[in-house]
């Protein structure tokens, strides 16, 4: 491995990211494919990945931390994960887990995807304690064999990689499984010096106001009326291709757009629908129409900064649409979607450079909130992979995945994950709400007209 400091990026230094990001792929296995051959192919792919991108076979450490300074996260060499050792872990749960066919036939409900069994690490935002005897790998891949299939969970340490980075890791494993060489461009981008990927503002350049990202002192945080986490629950819902088309058409009425908005994407329309219907059931419960409701979207800023998709570092910028609960519940879908699109349109190179400069200048980054002030009983945050063509990817002897999921981990209230679009054009959405709000959502006629319950 070259100088470990090269693996330090700017946006990945928030302590809250000391956790693991997960993407799970499911594959059917025919009887004529031996598990031994699958393990051999996966292990060869994992070794090739860690050889081509050495920091992936390293451990994540924090250096330079102390009073008033949260230090820097980087990957350093670790024999435990570096070739000839492997970042692949293998588990067989054939005897005591549902079959692959049962999971897929049920459309992949969260109840059949136990992260404590089918994943090697806990998930963001749950952190971990690392030590010499139990170091934190930059990436672990767990292959869980069950009757009729295999589940591949990619668990990437979040200070070093965002969702786009994990997707690129998956792409390179698929490339190797197809018997192809990892492209030179992918190797160069994966190993580039991260410290200067985002050009920070010069001292003389004005910085935007990012004070909303500073955490208020504990004494200033009002008591949260939300019930115990034991009452929070993850649930999957499906939006069919025809439903997505209908929502896009409804949300594309320019008469209701904010004047600055000229276009609404399908993802805008879907996120606006999620925002509006969840806000509506919460308004019925809370009876607080004037409370501001925020939807925060995690945005991949590689394109904004002209950084190739092969780059694996943290490149996420959060933007929010805001409307009072009462207005949001009664607004047209086009109005809600245009509010979200207007927020996306505010992202440009200067805004990102200003944000990165603000983060870089804070020695104690524990004082920063990931996306600003957030009331989980009102606000919500969404991360979307809808445009990622994982269902069409070729994994050599495994074929294409029949299921893409985030496994079931500790609940994170008001968090939404949008899964990649299937070959048929459907999109599945994972939502964490209180049981009461999930029940109210499933009883909402407007919701059930468009969303199919998976569980």
From Swiss-Prot:
EC number(s) recorded for this UniProt protein: 2.3.1.-
Keywords: Acyltransferase, Pigment, Transferase
UniProt xrefs under Gene3D superfamilies: Chloramphenicol acetyltransferase-like domain (3.30.559.10)
Biotechnology: As colorants, MonAzPs are widely used in various food products for centuries. Moreover, MonAzPs also possess wide-ranging biological activities such as antibacterial activity, preventing hypertension, lowering cholesterol levels, causing hypolipidemic effects, and displaying antiobesity and antitumor activities.
Biological or metabolic pathway of the protein: Secondary metabolite biosynthesis
Recorded family membership: Belongs to the trichothecene 3-O-acetyltransferase family.
Name of the featured protein: O-acyltransferase pigD
Species assigned in the record: Monascus ruber (Mold)
Gene: pigD
